[in-house]
């Protein structure tokens, strides 16, 4: 039978960890940030390329408050050269504001004009300071909002878009930043194995 399940979704992590055992499930559930941090600790992944810029980390409700996983995502970010981890003072970890996706809220149109995801996005943007890298969100020195939950990613991406900040702020999973630093996805270097056509 299945012994371990690896999940990128804190909602799935919570359900599989805390509810499935009531129905006889017996397996270990690992969130991808815990798993990837283990690979970094074992030197199987070595973040070496600088990923410059400020990174504001958003705590997912189901990863943090429900399952007390706060440090793994932060330790990954701190292991990446060039990253300046920014905390939203007074609104992080156990006091972090929800992204607004919980309880299927991401599928509802709120009656008032103040959507929770926009409020949270503005908190994160304020913590990053004035984004001055216009037109360079995917380059060096970019400001980044990072999370470790696909639901949060969707809500925060919508929040960034609602403020027309897509050019100034990128929204990435913590592990996407780790992959960048490890060179995952970089184009292969050119080789001289094939002869160039004669001129």
For each feature predicted by the language model, list its residue ranges:
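Iron-sulfur cluster-binding electron-transfer modules in prokaryotic oxidoreductases
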Residues: 1-199
